[in-house]
Design a protein with these regions (language model features):
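Conserved ABC ATPase "signature" region
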Residues: 3-23
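Helical segment within the ABC ATPase nucleotide-binding domain
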Residues: 67-79
C-alpha cells in the first residue's frame, strides 16, 4: 500500500514530466493514444516497483515523451531496479538494455549482451537492428 500523500507527490511529478497536469479535468475518452499511454506509464511508476515489465512502451508516444520515458527508466535502472521490456523499437532498446533476447517467428533465436550478439553473428560494429535483420535474412534462407 502507498500512503495517499506519497502517491500524490509521485503522480504530481510524473504529470508534470509528461505534460498532463492541465488535463486532470479531462475524461480519458478524449485522450489521444499517446496521452492514454502516458497515463499507463504514470500508473506503473507511482507504485515504485522493484521490477518494471513494459510491453511496447514507446507505442503512441511523441519523441519528447519517448525521451522522458527513457530518462525515467534510466533513473530507475540506476537505483537498482530491473526492467523487462518487449519492443520492436530496437534502436531505443539498444541504448537502454544490458542484454537481449531476440525472437523470430515465436522462437528464441539469439540472446546475450550486444557485444555477445556481435560476436555470435560475426558483426563487430553492428547495431541491434543490423543483427536482427541478419538473423531474419538467415532464417528466410
Amino acid at each position: 500500500d502507498i500512503e495517499q500523500e506519497t502517491a500524490f507527490e509521485r503522480v504530481d511529478k510524473l504529470l508534470e514530466m509528461f505534460r498532463l497536469k492541465e488535463k486532470l479535468d479531462w475524461f480519458p475518452v478524449h485522450f489521444s493514444k499517446g496521452m492514454k499511454q502516458k497515463v499507463m506509464i504514470i500508473c506503473a511508476f507511482v507504485v515504485d516497483p522493484s521490477l518494471f515489465i513494459v510491453d511496447e512502451p514507446f507505442l503512441g508516444l511523441d519523441p519528447v515523451a519517448i525521451a522522458d520515458l527513457i530518462q525515467l527508466l534510466d533513473e530507475e535502472k540506476k537505483k537498482g531496479k530491473s526492467i523487462l521490456m518487449s519492443t520492436h523499437v530496437l534502436d531505443s532498446a539498444e541504448k537502454m538494455c544490458d542484454s537481449f533476447v531476440i525472437l523470430h517467428k515465436g522462437q528464441v533465436r539469439a540472446k546475450g549482451s550486444l557485444t555477445e550478439l556481435r560476436a555470435q553473428f560475426q558483426m563487430p560494429d553492428a547495431s541491434l537492428n543490423d543483427i536482427y535483420l541478419a538473423l531474419t535474412e538467415e532464417a528466410a534462407l
